[in-house]
Amino acid sequence: MEKCTESLPNLNAETSFLRGGNLILQPQVQHPTDDKPPITGQVVPALNTPVMSGPYSGDHIPQFHGNPASVKGFFAQVTTYLRALDISNPADNARVKHFFDYLSQQMQNCDVLSESTQNNLLKQYENFVLELQQSFGEPMTQETTPPMNVTVDKSNISPQDATNFQLHAPNLSYRETNQRDQFQNGQADPTQNEEITDIMDNLPDLITQCIQLDKKHKDRPELLQSESHVPMFASTNHYQSFIGPVRPLPKDGPRQLQGAHLPVTPAKRARQQETQLCVYCNQAGHFTRDCLAKRSRTPARKKM
């Protein structure tokens, strides 16, 4: 109150100027207190001159000379001043906080302003803060989530904010519905389940067909023996046929050539490979593909 009574003429002049949409900050006379050092009528140099940043004190509060054309011009002047300070984080800087407190105090002292003028000043002040954050590399808009323990005052919500919330609410619900549907589709794929079910249902039929084919080819044991394993023992068989005596033919050899042969089991095939006998006629001294009995049973191919 003492401050306002001392600068009453200046305050009235400022009030009339603010009603016209402009803001003028005149040097105010303030009494020293114990908490903050006295604020002097220091004049900030011209905008083109860089301001040197020094230790924080009350003397660094800007007292701009001249009359800015409008509040927007004044805020642009303040922005240039704060950019010249080269502050890395303006939100935590003591000078910026002190300047904002000083500016808020000056605006509160002008309590005779109309409501519309105060709203315009507040809007320009918010724009100034956004421009200042952008100048330091911070984004203009940030998506923030309010804490759970913070209560929202519904009286401060503007109609525009309520309209934006109503427009975004269906989009959020639509996204949640799409994500839920995609998760359910990925969790249970009907086509994949049908394919697995068909394979399991056809498995007994496949086993039955394999058994029938095995019974059909029992009279042809050469089909049960893979010819791919034969070349592995070719060199050994020919080498032993030259350097070693030929084993005598067993007595039941002619009967084996005339009668039918039983299918070769895996155990018998392994034993024959160990003794290096013919897989078809169970005789030594020749290879399976050179067996005469096999050739005699194989039907002759017709020449085209």
Swiss-Prot record:
Signal peptide: none annotated. In adults, expressed in brain, eye, kidney, ovary and testis. Weakly expressed in thymus, heart and muscle. A zinc finger (CCHC-type) spans 276-293. The keyword Zinc applies. One of its GO terms (biological process) is norepinephrine metabolic process. Keywords: Metal-binding, Zinc, Zinc-finger. Gene3D superfamilies: Zinc finger, CCHC-type (4.10.60.10). Disruption phenotype: Mutants are viable and don't show growth retardation in the pre- and postnatal periods in either female or male mice. Animals are fertile, even in the case of mating between mutants. They exhibit abnormal behaviors related to cognition, including attention, impulsivity, and working memory. Animals show a reduced recovery rate of noradrenaline in the prefrontal cortex region. GO terms for molecular function: nucleic acid binding; zinc ion binding. RTL4 is one of at least 11 genes called Mar or Mart related to long terminal repeat retrotransposons. They do not correspond to functional retrotransposons, but rather to neofunctionalized retrotransposons genes. This is Retrotransposon Gag-like protein 4. The gene is Rtl4.
